[in-house]
Amino acid sequence: MTAEKREAKVVLVDIEGTTTSISFVHQVLFPHAKENVEKYLKEYWENEETKQIVEDLQQVPQYADYQATLSAPPAVVDVKVIAGFVRYLIDKDLKVTPMKTLQGLIWACGYASGELKGHVYEDVPDAFRAWQKAGLRIAVYSSGSVDAQKLIFGYSVAGNLLPYLSDHFDTHVGHKQEQQSYVNISNSLREKPQNILFLTDIPGEASAALSAGLQTIILHRPGNGPLSDDQKSNYEVIPDFKSLYSLQLPQK
């Protein structure tokens, strides 16, 4: 089935490499979090939300790996220790839920101050408008926290796009290359899997969604990773959302 002829009730979009350039995430957002994590922790160290994040960070398996990189085990878990661990996770692009939550809080300060603006491709607002007009729901599934998702779309270069979005999912629903995550999303949306179209740039995510019964299309935007010949033949691949402007609800 070609993109132009597809029907769906829900469009489920990934962010990085799909609605938003990978370079924005890796060259703007991640460095901003790295540069500001220590400042943020110092300011909000006694905040209950921060305390919970710090506790959760110490429970993840990667914390032991990080400690092994230190010259000596820290005598106390302080701002510098946790900030160092967060920078370690960012450098290794490890998608750890409490770290993602902390990143979202740091970015919130950056967006509120006007230092950050969420990047979206030019075709994204047009697609959102077309899908909403056609009666489709639009949901987001990203490894970034729900709060971080809302910041990108709420403070985007195209203005506030949140009114177009009905639902947000992050790693609390499961990891993106696991079939069960998409089953959980379908259940949460109260929609049959075959009525959900998932748009992503990662073949492993497309495979997991497909195995759960969702429709899938891979976005191959500028700067995205290369696709093998097998991946190009196994999945529908499109360069942008323009061929999906005409997406409609299933005909009864």
Swiss-Prot record:
Reaction catalysed by this enzyme: 5-methylsulfanyl-2,3-dioxopentyl phosphate + H2O = 1,2-dihydroxy-5-(methylsulfanyl)pent-1-en-3-one + phosphate
Example GO molecular function: acireductone synthase activity
Organism (species): Drosophila ananassae
Quaternary data: Monomer.
Cofactor note: Binds 1 Mg(2+) ion per subunit.
Similarity annotation: Belongs to the HAD-like hydrolase superfamily. MasA/MtnC family.
Ligand binding (substrate): S142, S143, K176
Keyword flag Lipid biosynthesis: no
Annotated Gene Ontology cellular component terms: cytoplasm; nucleus
Keywords: Amino-acid biosynthesis, Cytoplasm, Hydrolase, Magnesium, Metal-binding, Methionine biosynthesis, Nucleus
GO BP field: L-methionine salvage from methylthioadenosine
Pfam families for the chain: Hydrolase
Residues binding Mg(2+): D14, E16, D201
Ranges in a coiled coil: none
Role according to the record: Bifunctional enzyme that catalyzes the enolization of 2,3-diketo-5-methylthiopentyl-1-phosphate (DK-MTP-1-P) into the intermediate 2-hydroxy-3-keto-5-methylthiopentenyl-1-phosphate (HK-MTPenyl-1-P), which is then dephosphorylated to form the acireductone 1,2-dihydroxy-3-keto-5-methylthiopentene (DHK-MTPene).
Disulfide bonds: none
UniProt pathway: Amino-acid biosynthesis; L-methionine biosynthesis via salvage pathway; L-methionine from S-methyl-5-thio-alpha-D-ribose 1-phosphate: step 3/6; Amino-acid biosynthesis; L-methionine biosynthesis via salvage pathway; L-methionine from S-methyl-5-thio-alpha-D-ribose 1-phosphate: step 4/6
Gene3D superfamilies linked: 1.10.720.60, HAD superfamily/HAD-like (3.40.50.1000)
Superkingdom of this protein's organism: Eukaryota
EC class name: hydrolase
Cofactor: Mg(2+)
Name the record gives this protein: Enolase-phosphatase E1
CDD domains: HAD_EP
